[in-house]
Each structure stands twice: as structure tokens, then as C-alpha cells.
Regions:
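Catalytic core of pol beta-like nucleotidyltransferases
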Residues: 1-22, 30-36, 47-106
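Acidic Asp/Glu-based divalent-cation binding sites
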Residues: 39-41
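Short hydrophobic/aromatic beta-strand micro-patches
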Residues: 43-45
């Protein structure tokens, strides 16, 4: 099961793999509603990414050693800022409940 220590380990691994990025944990882990079925939902804001899909796959692989289910999304700060006030988007959810684990705020 995911706990606070696991979340911090995951964030540390992502910070090493994507220097200069902002990392926000959202979903049940951010709300403090972790259960045995929870996964770790993370949004990573990177300054420049050639392929968001390839980067999401790469960052998921970075978390494999933790042995937890994880959903890693990659976005630009511009996209986040544009959609964060629009209900029924993932960006809206992240803006409302996300926990920022990096000083470079989106």
C-alpha cells in the first residue's frame, strides 16, 4: 500500500529524472484517502518535452522500483494554466486538490 514515505520516494525519483520540473500529486494520495487499491497520480510540468507520451512512459519506468501502481501525466505550465479553471478536466482536479512537491510552481 502507498504511504507518505512512498509518495516522497516517488517524488524524489521524478525530481532526479526530470530536473527543473514541478511535480504535483493529486487524487486519493493528495486527499489523504489512500486505500489498498489506490494508485499514485502525479502530474509533472516540464519546461520542454518533445513527446509527452514518450516522457510519460519514461517517467513511469522511473517509478517501477517502488512496486506501486502509478499514473504519471506530463503537461506544460501553459496548458495547465489555460485549462485549470475549466471543470471536468484533469487540470481542474489537479489545481483544486493537488499537493505541490517542488518549488517551481505551475
Amino acid at each position: 500500500m502507498i504511504d507518505e514515505s512512498t509518495i516522497k520516494q516517488a517524488v524524489g525519483l521524478l525530481q532526479q529524472a526530470a530536473p527543473g520540473s514541478s511535480i504535483i500529486v493529486f487524487g486519493s494520495c493528495a486527499r489523504g484517502e489512500i486505500t489498498a487499491d489506490s494508485d499514485l497520480d502525479v502530474m509533472v510540468f516540464e519546461p520542454t518535452v518533445t513527446s509527452r507520451h514518450e516522457e510519460m512512459v519514461r517517467l513511469r519506468k522511473v517509478l517501477r522500483p517502488l512496486g506501486i501502481p502509478a499514473d504519471v501525466l506530463v503537461a506544460s505550465k501553459d496548458t495547465f494554466e489555460y485549462w485549470s479553471d475549466t471543470p471536468n478536466t484533469i487540470y481542474y482536479e489537479v489545481a483544486r486538490e493537488g499537493r505541490v512537491f517542488d518549488a517551481a510552481l505551475p
